[in-house]
């Protein structure tokens, strides 16, 4: 049902945040799942492009793996050549603290994300714009299939 029709009281005490984001572990699991799916498609002789969009509201605080481990997984995805192209986008939402933006930008640079977007607020308008950006990015990546090259990065 639409968000405006949800009763916020139904969600009281359901979730408690404690700054325990496992960003690196989550990115690794997502990338590995993408890799496995690409390998399965390649075995069936399908060409595939992939897009991994990582959306976070903060820094990593409790992963068991680090930035270098994420980079290794990204590098392996490219080296294994199961994908014609890979587009990786890191999106920080509601990022108001400069140190958080800096840390996410460092993550983007060290790991090799294709693109990093820092969104300062999580307003309805901003999230709608973000959804449109992701939709266009997926479409662009899909249209690049068979071209031998990556899709064009879009501007948020």
Spell out what each predicted region is:
Residues 27-79:
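Exposed acidic/Ser/Thr-rich ligand/metal-binding surfaces
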Residues 109-154:
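C-terminal helix of von Willebrand factor
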């Amino acid at each position: 049902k639409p968000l405006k029709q949800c009763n916020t009281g139904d969600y009281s005490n359901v979730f408690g945040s404690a700054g325990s984001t496992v960003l690196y572990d989550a990115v690794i699991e997502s990338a590995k799942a993408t890799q496995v799916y690409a390998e399965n498609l390649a075995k069936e002789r399908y060409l595939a492009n992939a897009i991994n969009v990582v959306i976070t509201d903060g820094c990593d605080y409790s992963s068991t793996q680090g930035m270098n481990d994420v980079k290794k997984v990204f590098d392996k995805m490219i080296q294994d050549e199961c994908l014609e192209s890979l587009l990786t986008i890191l999106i920080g939402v509601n990022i108001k603290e400069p140190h958080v933006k800096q840390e996410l930008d460092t993550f983007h640079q060290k790991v090799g994300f294709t693109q990093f977007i820092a969104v300062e607020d999580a307003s309805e308008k901003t999230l709608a714009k973000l959804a449109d950006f992701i939709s266009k990015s997926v479409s662009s990546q899909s249209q690049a299939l068979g071209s031998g090259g990556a899709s064009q990065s879009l501007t948020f």
